[in-house]
């Protein structure tokens, strides 16, 4: 037993060294601090992402509940914890400590990995947010670019409309010029008709003059019959005729000048008409060039339509690809859901295994690592799905760009259709104008034909007049011949001279009239050629107008067909746009569904991480509970062993005390008056208060010195404390400790004092000893062993009472010879010694476990 106490004391001394003063209470505190640090590490990334905040908010009540669950274990006294830790340290193997340290390091590493994964996840989420912001900025830029393109296209369309309007205005101006030229031609025709009327009037005047000349000639013939009588009258008539001839010459000259001027005017007008017709030909050629340009535009539109068809087919192929990719994403999501379900099932199984048995901790750790790997794979799949989503968003952006391009092309086609419709309306207006012009020209043609017929009639009339003039000349010549014959018959030479003069005059007049007729014929030929040229020009212009009308009709028909085809293509493009919009909406919906599913996957991942954290926390709790139970079990075993040792020691001490009491009783039977010396037992009991006084004097020292002093006392056997020879040994130990011969002086003083004083001093010393023991007990153990000590004190007191009863019975048997006073004094002494022995036994019992510790 002494060896056991020595080993326990050596263990306590090693644990109470300066380096390990606080070591007994450290293991459980360290575990709690580790758990707190782990919770703090788990909570630390909560400031990074909203998902981790959710996880923190979910895990915080669990952590609080875990702290609340652990809190009832805290009121355990530090004395018991120190004892348990000392016992555990005495029994624990280094393998368990290394295993615990490895487990802690693994847990720290796992927490660090989880925190790093959460940080990476937060970074990935931030990058996704940044990518979304950049995508929004790009969409805004694209919108701005599209707006700018729309503005440019609107400006270009406005410029095109302005150019078309300018061309239309130029055409209208040309038409107005043509109208003006037609009006000038009409005016020229009117002037020509007026000139013809004037010529007719002049011819009528000439005819009248010729009729007057015929009358004069008849008068001259009548007068020539009586030539002899009226020669003078004939001479006057000749003068009159000569004057008339001069007047006729003047009239002919004026008519010639007028006809030359009118001919020059007609030539100038015809040249102007030729220039106008050339301009019309140039405008017609320009119109043909415009028609060719429009045909090129129509061809370009057909090419654009083919490109739109190709884009439509590409859009269909892209939509099919997106549908296939969406199906693949749905399959991947289903696989992810299956993996999550399997992960939840595995987590439930892990929880059941953790709740069921503590032996399967290693299996649960391996499953946790598998779950981490699955989480990593899930995160990689989520990252891949996010990349696929980004690619899909990019492709959707490209599809939207193509759709916007198609919309722009459709708008362009609509604008071109509107322009074509406007041109069609204008062409219809031009056709109406052309028809009206044709009608007007036909009316003018009919007028010109009527004028030509009238001019022909006038020519015939002029021919008839010329014939009448020729007949008149023949008549005049016949009359001259008759007059000549008469004159010859009469034989008057004067008349012959007159007749010669008349012949000359007649020849001159004939020549003049012939010249006038030639000129009139030439003028008539010129007018006929001009009329024929005007007819030819009118017919050619009519043919040109008919050709233009036919071309316009054909062009209008073509334009109507093109408009119809363009309308059909526009309807088809509208349907395609609607389909593409529907497909885009479906793609957006699918993308939103995939995003929602991804969010659900992320939430489930967060929930899995939370469940992993909870599982880890529960596993830590279970490990702590196991360690606590093991320590409690070991402490209970050590307490049982200590109690057994204490029982053995107490039994031995009780036996020793009973022997001491018997010896004391036997010694008291001897006469107390011999030499006034104290008994051996009283001397031994006097030594104990001195030791207690020494410990009380040095109570300000550390606990280590007290424990060392108690060791020196407890290592001695109880028989040495009682015997006289050993009392000297105790005195030697006290001398070695204090370096002074206090015991010998105290013995001498005690021999001089009386027994009552010794008893009072012993009572005071026992009281001090009791107080010092109470102080040591408070320093060593706070409050928890009071019940055990009270039970032990009651047992010791009961045993002491039994021993006292036996001793009193022995005294009653042997001490009948004593007086009553002696009996009273003996009873008082026995009671005092009883109390002293009980208190000393309690002190020794209380100090024994301290020394063992």
From Swiss-Prot:
Name the UniProt key words of this record, in alphabetical order.
Answer: Chloroplast, Coiled coil, Phosphoprotein, Plastid, Transit peptide
Q: Which residues carry this modification: Phosphoserine?
A: 790
The protein's matches in Gene3D superfamilies, at most eight in alphabetical order, are given as: 1.10.287.1490
Q: Where is this region: Disordered?
A: 1-106, 386-465, 666-765, 778-820
Listed GO cellular component terms?
Answer: chloroplast; microtubule associated complex; plastid
Composition skew (Basic and acidic residues), residue ranges = 402-465, 698-718, 732-753, 778-788, 797-807
Keyword Plastid annotated: yes
Which residues, by range, are in coiled-coil regions? Answer: 94-670
Question: Ranges of Polar residues compositional bias?
Answer: 92-101
- One Pfam family it belongs to: WEMBL
Range annotated as the organelle transit peptide: 1-84
Q: Which family does it belong to?
A: Belongs to the WEB family.
What is the recorded name of this protein? WEB family protein At5g16730, chloroplastic
Q: Which organism is it from?
A: Arabidopsis thaliana
Phylogenetic placement of the source organism? Eukaryota, Viridiplantae, Streptophyta, Embryophyta, Tracheophyta
């Amino acid at each position: 037993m002494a060896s056991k106490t020595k080993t326990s004391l050596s263990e306590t001394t090693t644990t109470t060294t300066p380096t390990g003063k606080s070591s007994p209470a450290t293991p459980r505190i360290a575990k709690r601090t580790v758990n707190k640090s782990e919770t703090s590490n788990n909570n630390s990334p909560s400031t990074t992402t909203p998902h981790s905040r959710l996880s923190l908010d979910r895990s915080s009540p669990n952590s609080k509940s875990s702290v609340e669950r652990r809190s009832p274990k805290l009121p355990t006294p530090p004395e018991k914890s120190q004892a348990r830790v000392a016992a555990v340290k005495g029994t624990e193997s280094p393998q368990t400590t290394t295993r615990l340290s490895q487990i802690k390091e693994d847990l720290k590493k796992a927490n660090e990995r989880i925190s790093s994964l959460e940080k990476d996840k937060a970074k990935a989420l931030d990058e996704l947010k940044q990518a979304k912001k950049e995508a929004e900025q790009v969409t805004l830029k694209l919108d701005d670019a599209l707006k700018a393109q729309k503005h440019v296209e609107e400006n270009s369309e406005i410029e095109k409309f302005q150019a078309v309007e300018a061309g239309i205005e130029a055409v209208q101006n040309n038409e107005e010029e043509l109208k003006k030229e037609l009006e000038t031609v009409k005016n020229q025709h009117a002037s020509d008709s007026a000139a013809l009327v004037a010529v007719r009037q002049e011819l009528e005047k000439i005819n009248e003059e010729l009729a007057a000349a015929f009358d004069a000639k008849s008068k001259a013939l009548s007068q020539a019959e009586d030539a002899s009588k009226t020669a003078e009258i004939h001479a006057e008539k000749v003068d009159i005729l000569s004057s008339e001839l001069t007047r006729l010459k003047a009239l002919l000259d004026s008519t010639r000048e007028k006809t030359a001027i009118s001919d020059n005017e007609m030539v100038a007008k015809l040249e102007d008409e030729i220039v106008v017709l050339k301009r019309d030909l140039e405008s017609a050629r320009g119109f043909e060039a415009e028609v060719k340009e429009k045909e090129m535009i129509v061809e370009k539109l057909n090419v654009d339509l083919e490109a739109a068809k190709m884009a439509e087919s590409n859009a269909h192929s892209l939509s099919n690809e997106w549908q296939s990719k969406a199906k693949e994403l749905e399959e991947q999501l289903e696989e992810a859901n299956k993996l999550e379900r399997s992960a939840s099932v595995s987590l439930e199984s892990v929880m059941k295994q953790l709740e069921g048995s503590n032996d399967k901790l290693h299996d649960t750790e391996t499953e946790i690592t598998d779950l981490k790997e699955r989480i990593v794979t899930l995160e990689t799949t989520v990252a891949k799905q996010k990349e696929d989503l980004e690619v899909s968003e990019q492709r959707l952006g490209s599809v939207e760009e193509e759709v916007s391009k198609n919309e722009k092309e459709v708008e362009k086609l609509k604008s071109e259709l509107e322009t074509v419709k406007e041109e069609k309306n204008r062409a219809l207006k031009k056709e109406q104008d052309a028809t009206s012009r044709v009608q007007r020209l036909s009316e003018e043609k009919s007028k010109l034909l009527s004028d030509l017929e009238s001019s022909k009639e006038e020519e015939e009339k002029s021919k008839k007049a010329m014939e009448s003039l020729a007949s008149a000349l023949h008549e005049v010549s016949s009359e001259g011949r008759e007059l000549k014959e008469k004159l010859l018959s009469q034989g008057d030479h004067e008349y012959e001279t007159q007749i010669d003069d008349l012949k000359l005059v007649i020849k001159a007049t004939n020549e003049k009239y012939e010249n006038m007729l030639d000129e009139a014929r030439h003028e008539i030929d010129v007018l006929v050629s001009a009329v024929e040229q005007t007819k030819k020009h009118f017919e050619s212009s009519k043919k040109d107008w008919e050709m233009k009308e036919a071309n316009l009709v054909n062009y209008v028909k073509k334009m109507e067909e093109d408009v119809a085809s363009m309308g059909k293509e526009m309807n088809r493009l509208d349907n395609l746009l609607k389909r593409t919009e529907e497909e885009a909406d479906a793609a957006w919906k699918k993308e939103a569904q995939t995003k929602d599913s991804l969010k659900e996957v992320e939430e489930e991942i967060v929930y899995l991480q939370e469940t992993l954290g909870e599982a880890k926390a529960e596993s830590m709790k279970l490990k702590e509970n196991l360690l606590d139970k093991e320590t409690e079990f070991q402490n209970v075993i050590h307490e049982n062993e200590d109690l057994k040792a204490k029982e053995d020691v107490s039994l031995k001490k009780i036996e020793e005390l009973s022997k001491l009491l018997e010896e004391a009783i036997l010694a008291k039977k001897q006469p107390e008056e011999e030499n006034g010396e104290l008994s051996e037992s009283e001397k031994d009991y006097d030594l104990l208060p001195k030791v207690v006084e020494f410990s009380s004097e040095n109570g300000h020292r550390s606990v280590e010195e007290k424990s060392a002093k108690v060791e020196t006392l407890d290592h001695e056997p109880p028989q040495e404390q009682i015997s006289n020879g050993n009392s000297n040994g105790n005195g030697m130990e006290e001398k070695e400790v204090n370096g002074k011969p206090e015991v010998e002086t105290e013995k001498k003083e005690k021999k001089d004092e009386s027994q009552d004083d010794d008893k009072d001093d012993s009572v005071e010393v026992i009281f001090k000893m009791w107080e010092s023991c109470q102080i040591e007990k408070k320093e060593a153990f706070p409050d928890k062993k009071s019940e055990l000590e009270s039970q032990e004190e009651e047992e010791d007191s009961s045993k002491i009472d039994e021993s006292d009863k036996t001793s009193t019975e022995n005294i009653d048997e042997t001490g009948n010879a004593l007086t009553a006073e002696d009996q009273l004094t003996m009873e008082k002494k026995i009671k005092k010694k009883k109390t002293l022995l009980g208190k000393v036994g309690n002190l020794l019992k209380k100090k024994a476990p301290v020394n063992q510790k």
